[in-house]
């Protein structure tokens, strides 16, 4: 079973949920290693507490999935999550959002692979790159 950390902002919950659908529909057996939305650290914790919670999740995961949209280049959290994944030698799977013409150079440079926005691409990347 893969332990998958999906980088996300709850502002982009639809994309996050679609990644979960891709994994479910693609037959990948996984444990969602992301920090849950209802975890109090999101609303009551400091940035440092959230960072520590994310790092604990990344440290124990098989791979990190990051949406490779251009917005990722400007997200302080995605850049921190990339640094955490690299620190703990976790493969990064970048997912190019459907219809996107450009992707984040930050994600592109850090990713082990960039996949297309579909279940087969995402699931094949997990099977190939996850530890």
Language model features: what each stretch is:
Residues 47-51, 79, 119:
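Structural motif corresponding to alpha-helix initiation and N-cap regions
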Residues 123-131:
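A charged, well-structured terminal subsegment
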